Amino acid sequence: MSVIIALAALALLMLAAYRGYSVILFAPIAALGAVLLTDPSAVAPAFTGVFMEKMVGFIKLYFPVFLLGAVFGKLIELSGFSRSIVAAAIRLLGTRQAMLVIVLVCALLTYGGVSLFVVVFAVYPFAAEMFRQSNIPKRLIPATIALGAFSFTMDALPGTPQIQNIIPSTFFNTTAWAAPWLGVIGTIFVFCAGMLFLQRQRNKAQRTGEGYGSDLRNEPETAADIKLPNPWIALSPLLAVGIMNLLFTQWIPQWYGKTHSLALPGMATPVTTEIAKLTAIWAVQAALLVGILMVLAFGYKAISRKLAEGSKSAVSGALLAAMNTASEYGFGAVIASLPGFLVLADWLKSIPNPLVNEAVTVTLLAGITGSASGGMSIALAAMANDFIAAAHAANIPLEVMHRVAAMASGGMDTLPHNGAVITLLAVTGLTHREAYKDIFCITLIKTLAVFVVIGTFYATGIV
C-alpha cells in the first residue's frame, strides 16, 4: 500500500503538469496528500520541515542563476543578436540545418559548463528566430533544446562538468572522464537517434502543411527597424559565458581558499562558507554578469527602447521557472522520505546484474523525484557500497559503474513533472499538450542509451 501511495502522488503531479495546472500549487498538494495517507499527524511537519526546507534551499542556491540567465536571454533577444546569428547560420548552412545548429549550440554551452537552465533562457531566442525563418513548427523547439542540453552533454560525453557527471565520482572515486569510450558510444547513439527523430517530425509536419504557427506565446521581440550587428559580435557574449564560466571555476577557489569567514560589523557571529560547494554556482553567476555587460556594451542603443519592459518580463520568467523547479525539488524530498519509496528502493536491490541493477535503480528514482541529480544522489547514497561490492565480485571497473549511473540519471528524469521540462515549456510559451510528446521521445532515446552502453561493455569489454 505504501508503494501505491508514493506512485499515486507521482501520477497526480504528472497528470496536473500535463494538463497545464500549476506545479507550484500541485507539487505540495500531491506530496502532502501522500503524507496524509501515510501519517496524518506528519502533514504540517513534513510541509515545513521537508517540503519548504528543500524548496527554500533550492531558491537560495539557484534563483540568481535563473534571474541572470533570464536577463541574459532577454537582452540577447532585444539587441537583435539572436536574429544576427540566425541570419548568419542560415546563410552558411541553409534552413535545412536549423535543428542541427540549435542542438550543437546547446551541446557546446552545456559541455562548456553552462547550466542547462541558463541554456534554455539563452538559446530560446535563437531557436525561435531560426525555426520561424525555416518554417519549422515551434512545438519542436523544446525537444530540440532537450536533445542538445538535457542529454549527451549532461551525462554521457566524457569530461562534461555538469553535476550529473560529477556526483558519481564522489561515490566511486573516479573522475569526470570515467569510461570515455562507453561515454562516446552513448553520445553517438543519443545524438544520431535524436536527430533522426527530430528530422522525421519536421518532415511529417511539412507533409501536412504545418508551419511555425501563429498566435503564439512568449515570442522573442526584436525591433524591425534596428540594424543587425556583426554576427561575430553577436556571438561573442555567448562564447564569453562559456569561457568565463571555466575561468571563474578555476579562479574562485584560488581567491577564497577552501572556506571563507564573513564577519561584518553588524553580524553577531561570522558566517563560514565552504567554497567548494558554491564554486560552480558562483562561476556561472559571474560568467552571466560578464555576458550581460557585453550585450549592453555592444547593443545598448537597440536595447534601451525596451529595456524597462524587457527586464520586467525577464524577472517574471525567472520567478516562474525557479518556483516551478523548486516546488519539484520539495516534492521529491517528501516522496523520498516516505516508506513506500524505501520499499521500492529495497526491491530494486534484488536485480542480480550489477550494471542493470544500477541503471534501473537510478533512472526510476530520477523519474520518481523528477530530478536526475536528486534521483542519482538518493540511489548512490543508499546503495553505492552494494554497487561497489557487486562490481568487484563481477570484475566490473568502477569507471563503468560511474558512466552507467550518470547516463541512467538522464533517462526517465524528464517526465512531465521534471523541473527542467516545466522551465523549458514555460520559457518557450508552450504547454505539455503541445510539445511534451516530442520531449518524451527524446526521453525514451536517453533511457535506451544506457542499456546500449551496458550491452556494448558486455559484448566488447571496452571502457
PLM segments and residue spans:
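Hydrophobic core segments of alpha-helical transmembrane domains in multi-pass membrane transport
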Residues: 5-17, 28-37, 66-71, 105-110, ...
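Long, contiguous bundles of hydrophobic transmembrane helices that form the permeation core
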Residues: 6, 38, 181-310, 427-428, ...
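Short helix-coil transition sites and intra-membrane helix breaks within transmembrane domains
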Residues: 19-23, 59-62, 73-83, 109-122, ...
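Core transmembrane alpha-helical segments of multi-pass membrane transporters/permeases
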Residues: 25-28, 48-83, 108, 275-340
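Hydrophobic alpha-helical transmembrane segments of multi-pass integral membrane proteins
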Residues: 63-69, 92-129, 322-330, 351-389
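Re-entrant/interfacial helical elements at transmembrane boundaries that shape
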Residues: 70, 84-86, 117-130, 159-171, ...
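Interfacial loop-to-transmembrane junctions
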Residues: 89, 93, 424-445
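Alpha-helical transmembrane segments of multi-pass membrane proteins
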Residues: 96-109, 136-153, 179-188, 354-368, ...
